[in-house]
Amino acid sequence: MTIDYSYITIIIPTLNEAENIERLIDSIFLLYPSISCLIVDDGSEDETQSIVLALKNKYSNLDLMDRSKEPVKGLCSSVVDGIQSCRTEYFIIIDGDGQHPPEFIQYCIKTLNLGADLSIGTREPYATRWTFSRIVISYSASILAKIRLLLCGVTIRDPMSGFFGGKTKFVQDILSQHKKSFTLGGYKILFDILKKVPKKCNLSGFYYPFGLRECGTSKLTIKIIIRYVLSFFR
């Protein structure tokens, strides 16, 4: 029996992911045929958008949002626009670089079906091929985020995760009420959302193996790190 996933939208923010995106989209629809998938592209200069548009002929539930003319760029603003445009009951965010395994989307769905307002993926031990500096940056950012969230009464294993899902209306309300306090040019939208969740929010999660980028280059820059640090004071 085919499982119905039509009440869920997978939102994938992209920027120059031509080497990854087709394989990722094919995997998603192979595993979850009835799910919706929205690619939110931040103005790719490669063939990312052309590939997605071609795949729309193959997958009727695939859509593309082109943000190339938007004044504010960045991963956070792409995710915010994707969530605000979502029309299904639930959404799930994954990266377009292959680091979030599509086969683990099912575990996010399971926790959402059990009543979670937000379901957050926790990265398993760091990939063995990560550089020492990358491990230090990631670990330090996570510790700082946990301390900041404790001030809001929120305890979570991996506040820097980019793999998470939630009730669409629940998160849309948070965005509409607190959007000015979000770092839209930043890199980690979940951290901003968690700072604004109500005290009785039902937070749940799942574990997943955090992969290495399959192709392309990381979007993490010094400017993004500075914006992240400044977000602690919002």
Placement of each model-derived feature along the sequence:
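Acidic helix N-cap motif at the loop->helix transition within catalytic regions
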Residues: 19-23, 46-55
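Hydrophobic helical membrane-anchoring modules
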Residues: 1-8, 23, 30, 151, ...
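Short loop->beta transition adjacent to catalytic acidic/histidine clusters or analogous donor-positioning motifs
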Residues: 5-9, 29-39, 47, 60-63
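Short aromatic/hydrophobic "clamp" motif used to bind/position activated sugar donors
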Residues: 91
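A conserved hydrophobic helix/loop-capping motif in glycosyltransferases and polysaccharide synthases
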Residues: 8-17, 24
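A conserved acidic beta->alpha catalytic loop
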Residues: 41-50, 98
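Acceptor/aglycone-binding surface of glycosyltransferases and processive sugar-polymer synthases
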Residues: 67-85, 99-183, 187, 213-223
